[in-house]
């Protein structure tokens, strides 16, 4: 079997593995008494991750360069990163809901790359002179892994909003750094709560009134875990995004003589950085937990997709892959 046929077999195999994996996770969420399904789903994600690693390795051998230079390659690299980050997040959370959230995204990316892209966009081509640089691996791979981490973290925030139905809840665990400690007490006589927020060392007290959703202990524990793991995964993706942007600026200066040219991709990378910087700032310095940072991360989910795929398909700028519809 030649390398091209091997790649075709591996991308089809990845799709064939991820589809039943998704069904396992969703069935496990719908029927919690079926205890073995999450383990099958985890195994499916791990096997899919290995298939994509083998596909990228075969592509590297065929083309002679790190396989991340076109849309097909970057989509599979992103899906590989998603499945890897998923395995980390699932280990941290121990929840089958992680797979129920991330497996559809991984499956959709693989299906788009394997079955939607035109054949000419799936073929390896010689690198243009500007891409014949070690910065290709440094910049693009770090950016793609950061996208994967930010997407998984944002999806966990979406899952948090689903579990809590978008309502304010009491979170007893702490997933913040130096932020204020907040304790919420439920007023049994009404649907309102009086929340007392004490800032460390300031002596100030703020009294707030807002409805708080009452959850079963299992749901409350799950929501707290999703909030915590989402924060940690986004905390992993943000420094990688920062490193990737800096590496891209250095590469741009070497290739075109300018660190920053306000290319659409550069602009949206900056917007993405600002959104998640605001998220981390709110959590670390303001002590945000629960609904508000989850909403901000959900916005970030859309921003990442615009940054990665939206501006690339417009056919404009130095990062364009070209529109194909």
Curated annotation (Swiss-Prot):
Superkingdom of the organism of origin: Bacteria
Subcellular localization(s) per the UniProt record: Cellular thylakoid membrane
Keywords: Cytochrome c-type biogenesis, Membrane, Thylakoid, Transmembrane, Transmembrane helix
Record membrane topology: Multi-pass membrane protein
Any GO CC annotation of this UniProt entry: plasma membrane-derived thylakoid membrane
Molecular function per GO: heme binding
Similarity comment: family membership: Belongs to the CcmF/CycK/Ccl1/NrfE/CcsA family.
Descriptive protein name: Cytochrome c biogenesis protein CcsA
